[in-house]
Amino acid sequence: MYILGDIGNTETKIWLVSKKNKIIKKINFSSKEITNNKLSIILKKNNFKFKYVKKILFCSVVPQTFNLIKKFLSKKTNRNCYEVKNLNLKSLIKVKVDYKQVGSDRITNAISLMNGKNNFIILDFGTATTFDVLIQNTYYGGIIAPGVKLSL
């Protein structure tokens, strides 16, 4: 099994996924003020099993929260926990902007749509609304605007 996660400014989502890519469990919780104790309670309450976890991968725009979750999950599973931007993705996707300036959530969105044939304008409605451009497996960047809730 795999643990996949998305740590945003407002919300963190964690999925437990089978080797056949079936979502077994999904948990959402606030990214604000997360502690080891709160994380432990959330995962116990959701009957999260660590025994069979083989790999852990996150995209995160909140480094402090990722570091806390990384240490917690690495300890519980005895596995390394990786962040998408820390992986060498140059052979997977071409990025035409400063890679350091792009959030891993935006890179992950682009990778998820790559098919070599189609071009995409990628919209993501989170705390911020992002608009990104993917042309034939090349990420050209985009813009960030206030999220829907902030705009109301």
List the predicted regions and their residue ranges.
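Gly/Thr-rich phosphate-binding beta-strand-loop-beta motif of the actin/hexokinase/Hsp70
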Residues: 1-24, 113, 117-137
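Conserved phosphate-binding catalytic cores of ATP/NTP-utilizing and phosphoryl-transfer enzymes
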Residues: 91-120
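Glycine-rich phosphate-binding loop plus the immediately following alpha-helix
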Residues: 31-35, 114-116, 141-152
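Short, charged, surface-exposed secondary-structure boundary motifs
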Residues: 36-40, 91-95, 151-152
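Gly/Ser/Thr-rich beta-alpha loop segments that engage phosphate groups in nucleotides
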Residues: 10, 105, 128, 143-144, ...
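Conserved phosphate-binding loops in N-terminal lobes of ATP-dependent enzymes
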Residues: 2-80
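A general structural signal for well-ordered alpha-helical segments in protein cores
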Residues: 66, 106-110, 152
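Short beta-strand-loop/turn "lid" adjacent to the catalytic site in phosphate-handling enzymes
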Residues: 50-102, 135-148
